[in-house]
Amino acid sequence: MGIISFIFALAEDMLLAAIPAVGFAMVFNVPQRALRWCALLGAIGHGSRMIMMSAGFNIEWATFLAALLVGSIGIQWSRWYLAHPKIFTVAAVIPMFPGISAYTAMISAVKISHFGYSEEMMILLLSNFLKASSIVGALSIGLSIPGLWLYRKRPRV
């Protein structure tokens, strides 16, 4: 993949990630002045995950690092705009949720229930379930660590 096609793919990925970030921010009643920042943070998070995955990271670690980035930027923006960090961060990480892995695991469970046990369906179910669970765990831990680091009351040592 050439650099120009990668930049276009990255721009497309970031633009398409900003749309659900704004949509979920509207569902969560985020103030209108913060919607553009939710879109930008969602685009930054999803774009950074895409860059890391194309650099060779697996999706779980790339999601964890992208969530760390989103959490850190959200805390900084909350100080600038005098708002809670969750206003920016929660809607921004939703585009990174593992919809395809969770859906495939659910469909595999339904097929096992309907057609009976088969080894390949069980492998598909477990691998996709563990992948989706790991991504959700990476999102939640990565989003909470910057707050634990930056709002710490006691000295680090």
Swiss-Prot record:
UniProt main location, coarse: membrane
The keyword Amino-acid biosynthesis appears for this protein: no
Record-annotated membrane-spanning stretches: 2-22, 55-75, 87-107, 129-149
Function according to Swiss-Prot or TrEMBL: Involved in succinate export with YjjP. Both proteins are required for export.
Family, per entry: Belongs to the ThrE exporter (TC 2.A.79) family.
NCBIfam families per record: PRK09917.1 (NF007391)
PANTHER family, alphabetized: SUCCINATE TRANSPORTER SUBUNIT YJJB-RELATED (PTHR34390:SF1), UPF0442 PROTEIN YJJB-RELATED (PTHR34390)
UniProt protein name: Probable succinate transporter subunit YjjB
Source organism of the structure: Klebsiella pneumoniae subsp. pneumoniae (strain ATCC 700721 / MGH 78578)
UniProt lineage: Bacteria, Pseudomonadati, Pseudomonadota, Gammaproteobacteria, Enterobacterales
